[in-house]
A protein has these predicted regions:
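Long, terminal "pre-/pro-" and other extracytoplasmic accessory regions
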Residues: 1-169
């Protein structure tokens, strides 16, 4: 019964060590899990193309990129807390034949503002209609709740093509 004793000893102490206020360092696997869950992507559906330890503003982060459903995701997760420092998303591009602006500016603004709970028109800081490879798109920026959201919305389909989130210091 010598094998049973070490297993018993481990059940009491480590459980409390890990639950101190729920904040602590995260490893690479935990950082990937945090990013995937935030994006609503199952690990089985993601093809991780980059996962490495990096530094952002002097802070250790895991830089994690993956593709899922034709879209690209890019996350930075703080090593010391597991906090999402930044997250980005680039959707599939529509065909170049969709060069008519069929989505109104008001509808596109509503799409963007609906993604940021509590934000209103006064939180929109940049807004313009631009063309990317002949495709019309709205580009904008929302600053709300200490966070900056930069986005691109396809002006022909209304689809969110890019969505980048960064906490402001």
């Amino acid at each position: 019964s010598a094998a049973a004793a070490p297993a018993q000893a481990q059940t009491s102490a480590p459980a409390t060590a890990q639950t101190v206020t729920g904040i602590g360092t995260v490893d690479e696997a935990a950082a990937q899990k945090i990013a995937l869950e935030h994006a609503g992507v199952k690990a089985a559906d993601a093809t991780i193309t980059k996962s490495k330890l990096d530094y952002e503003d002097g802070r250790q982060v895991y830089d994690i990129e993956w593709y899922a459903g034709g879209a690209k995701y890019d996350y930075e997760i703080a090593v010391d807390t597991g906090e999402i420092i930044s997250s980005g998303y680039e959707g599939k591009t529509a065909g170049a034949d969709s060069n008519n602006v069929t989505v109104s500016e008001a509808a596109a603004k509503k799409t963007a503002l609906d993604r940021v709970s509590g934000a209103t028109d006064k939180d929109l800081y940049e807004w313009k209609l631009d063309y990317d490879d002949g495709r019309p798109e709205y580009e904008g920026k929302i600053i709300y709740g200490g966070t900056e959201y930069e986005f691109t919305i396809d002006a022909a389909t209304g689809a969110v093509m890019e969505w980048d989130v960064e906490k402001l210091r």
